[in-house]
Amino acid sequence: MTVKERIAALRAHMKETGIDAYLIPTDDFHGSEYVGEYFKCRKYITGFTGSAGTALIMQDMAGLWTDGRYFIQAANQLEGTGITLFKMGEPEVPTIHEFLKKNLTQGMCLGFDGRTVSAKEAEELEKMLDENGVSLSVDHDLAGDIWENRPVLSCEPVTELDIKWAGESRADKCARIRKAMEKKGADLFVLTSLDDIAWLLNIRGGDIHCCPVVLSYLVMTKTEIRLFANEKAFQTDVLEALEKDGVILFPYDSIYEYVKTFKKDKKVLLCKKKVNSRLVSNIPADTRILDEENLTLLPKAAKNPVEVENERIAHIRDGAAVTKFIYWLKKNVGRIPITELSAAEKLYEFRSEQEDFIDNSFDPIIAYGKHAAIVHYFATPETDIPLEPSGFLLADTGGHYKEGTTDITRTIVMGPATEEEKKYFTAVLRGTLNLGAARFLHGCTGVNLDILARQPLWEMGEDFKHGTGHGVGYLLNVHEGPNSFRWKIIPGGNAVLEEGMITSDEPGYYREDGFGIRHENLMVCKKAEKTEYGQFMCFEFLTMVPFDLDGVVPELMSVRERNLLNDYHAQVYEKISPYLNEEEKEWLKDATRAI
């Protein structure tokens, strides 16, 4: 079926079930950023393939809301479908809540699959629409009902993460969380975020593409841990090891019945922003719910010393692979046929040669020329274009290693660049360097520091429409909270930067139909000196790959900025050159020369 035919089928199904408006978010049952094939209902109905967005279908309209990363991509993919693009955050563009409030009236019904909407979101919708006399219907997966040949739920093998990689045993982690439960006065802790469960139990899987997680739910009490997952994914030795630490396996879907048995005198701690609305609605009404952040959130984000040291190793190996790739590109562009897709395959080949490499940490963004202006462009056979010895190639890629997860962006100068292109290339690089060199008092958040990355562009009256940085998991999700860099203050989204947190530093500049630039390093937060003013903090770059000096205008940089770049490049050469052959080493020596 075409997109128009799918929407028509969905509208007919809505009429049958008495639903006037149907909401289709991106989420799976666990609030994951990226989802398995089974959960891609929004993509199936709309044809939009971006990782963020919400569709709304009514009898007389169809709309898609997405953020600035995907404006260009969404406009292209929605063309001719009859779906209206709502550009989130733009002037005069209503939020999806504002649109629903205005367009749903007395007696109408809003529907969605309650397993794909958080309890907090559902409560907000119910409160807002109740004022209009609008009801909610949350027990129907209407989009799934009409999905022909829908993929099955993933069930990839589960493995244990050895303590030499994790740095802390499962038993010790569970003891820590139980102490936190005790402090909160909680009798039960409901955990449904897949990366949190994987971190807590020191297990990894493959149920989401590029995300080594296991489809599961978890309930912890003072005496037992119930893990709800598909038993077929677990080998006997893994099950026995889990049972030894008090973890008992139950069928994946059985949690929805289990939570109905919670007693009224018990206090249940869960995060309504993370747990889906159907699960929470199944908890007896007289049970007291403590709505708080997951107790695993901060311990997971603040990597322990073993994890940090392992990450340094992973980034050196990854740096060697990406450096080899850049050398190969520079040497061969214009001499042999190379396209965006074949370049991505070549980079995967270089990574695969590295010890302990597992997989990409996300689908690679290899964007040439004007494609780089699309912030999260993914090449397809239909969009793939050849690389030429001119302009910029933006390569935003990453890998999973046993030692951790990487995420790096380099803008590679493929041939002669204009003075204007170099001006913006240098401005973005200055932002990356200045943020990476920040020294700040403990208690600062990413909001306090974000201006360091944007200032060079703001001075030019320019900006970029994405966050400056995100947290990164340890052999887990490449996007991890709560740490981030952004200038907008978001309630509940401004975590203090703690020792061990790994965060990306990735300002950019994008000119539609022109070019795109992004420079990204991962960095770990560390303690610096302590004085009478308090504990000072700093960052250490983990990423070890040269920035392309062919795009840099030294005269546009301060002496301090040039020194920062030179010092970084000296580190890159020292750590990466031992992994290169003589030709590559000679090239790297020039690529990291002092300016």
Question: Model segments located where?
Answer:
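Active-site neighborhoods and metal-handling regions in enzymes and metal-associated proteins
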Residues: 1-595
